[in-house]
C-alpha cells in the first residue's frame, strides 16, 4: 500500500514512525519546510519539502500511486486540508485526518475569538502584547495593535521575515514548545499584559502558554481552530495506526 503523509508537525513524525513499523508500506511524506522534511527522512521512503497547491498534490498522488492520504498538518493549515479532501474525493482515494485534541480552558481572563483580526482588535487596548502564534498572522496583528506595542516569539527560521515587521529588540527567536515557567518569565520580562495565541493542542504547548500567562497576570486571547467537516478524523495516534493497519489487510 502507498501512503501519503502530509506533515510538518510533531504529531506527524510520531505517526510516520509508527506507520514505518507496520511494514510493507511505501510512505511519501510532505512538509512545507526543509526542517520538517529532514524529520521525515527518519521514516519515509520519499520526502517532498515544498507547499503543494491543489493541482500539484493531485499530480503527486498520481505519480506515486497513492492509496491513502493521512493529513497530519497543523490545525490551522486549513487550505492544505481543504485541498487534500477535495483531491481525494476527485481521485477516489481514502482521506484520513489526524488532529490534536482541543483544550478549552475556562477562566475570566481568557477570551476565545474566531480569527486573528478579532484578536488584534481586542489586544489593541493593551499596553503591550506578546504574540505567541507564529509568523503567519504577525503582520496583521502588528498593523492593528501598533508596531511599538507587540513582542513576537517566532521560530529561528522565521526571523528574517519577522525583521521586516518588527525591530530586533521585539523579536524572541526560539524553537520548540516551552514550560509554563519559561512562558511566564518571558511575559513578565517584556511587561506584557496580553498574549495572543491559538488553540494548537497539547503538542503545540497551548496549556503551558495559557497558564504561564495567567500566572504572569496577563489576559489571554485565544484564536479558535477553523472548523472543517473531515470525512474520517482521529485524535488518538494509536487508533489512527490501527485503522490504517486494518486497511492493509
From Swiss-Prot:
Q: In which pathway does it act?
A: Cofactor biosynthesis; adenosylcobalamin biosynthesis; cob(II)yrinate a,c-diamide from sirohydrochlorin (anaerobic route): step 7/10
Record has NAD as a keyword: yes
Which GO molecular-function terms appear in the entry?
Answer: precorrin-6A reductase activity
GO biological process terms, alphabetically, are: cobalamin biosynthetic process
Ordered alphabetically, the record's keywords are: Cobalamin biosynthesis, NAD, Oxidoreductase
Q: What is its EC number?
A: 1.3.1.106
Q: Which domain of life is it from?
A: Archaea
What is the annotated signal peptide range for this record? none
- Summarize the protein's role: Catalyzes the reduction of the macrocycle of cobalt-precorrin-6A to cobalt-precorrin-6B.
Family statement drawn from the similarity comment of this UniProt entry? Belongs to the precorrin-6x reductase family.
The entry's protein name is Cobalt-precorrin-6A reductase
State the species of origin.
Answer: Methanocaldococcus jannaschii (strain ATCC 43067 / DSM 2661 / JAL-1 / JCM 10045 / NBRC 100440)
Amino acid at each position: 500500500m502507498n501512503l501519503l503523509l502530509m506533515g510538518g508537525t510533531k504529531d506527524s513524525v510520531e505517526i510516520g514512525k509508527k506507520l514505518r513499523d507496520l511494514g510493507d508500506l511505501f510512505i511519501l511524506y510532505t512538509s512545507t519546510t526543509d526542517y520538517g522534511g529532514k524529520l521525515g527522512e527518519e521514516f519515509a521512503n520519499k520526502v517532498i519539502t515544498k507547499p503543494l497547491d491543489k493541482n500539484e498534490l493531485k499530480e503527486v498522488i498520481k505519480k506515486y500511486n497513492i492509496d491513502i492520504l493521512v493529513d497530519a498538518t497543523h490545525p490551522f493549515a486549513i487550505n492544505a486540508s481543504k485541498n487534500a479532501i477535495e483531491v481525494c474525493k476527485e481521485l477516489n482515494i481514502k482521506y484520513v485526518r489526524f488532529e490534536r485534541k482541543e483544550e478549552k480552558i475556562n477562566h475570566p481572563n481568557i477570551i476565545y475569538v474566531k480569527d486573528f483580526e478579532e484578536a488584534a482588535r481586542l489586544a489593541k487596548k493593551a499596553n503591550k502584547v506578546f504574540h505567541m502564534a507564529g509568523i503567519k498572522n504577525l503582520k496583521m496583528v502588528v498593523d492593528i495593535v501598533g508596531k511599538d506595542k507587540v513582542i513576537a516569539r517566532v521560530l529561528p527560521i522565521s526571523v528574517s521575515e519577522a525583521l521586516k515587521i518588527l525591530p530586533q529588540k521585539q523579536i524572541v527567536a526560539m524553537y520548540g514548545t516551552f514550560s509554563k515557567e519559561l512562558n511566564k518569565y518571558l511575559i513578565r520580562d517584556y511587561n506584557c499584559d496580553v498574549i495572543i495565541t491559538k488553540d494548537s493542542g497539547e503538542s503545540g504547548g497551548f496549556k503551558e502558554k495559557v497558564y504561564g500567562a495567567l500566572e504572569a497576570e496577563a489576559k489571554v486571547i485565544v484564536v479558535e481552530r477553523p472548523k472543517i467537516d473531515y470525512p474520517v478524523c482521529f485524535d488518538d495516534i494509536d487508533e489512527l495506526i490501527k485503522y490504517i493497519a486494518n486497511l492493509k489487510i
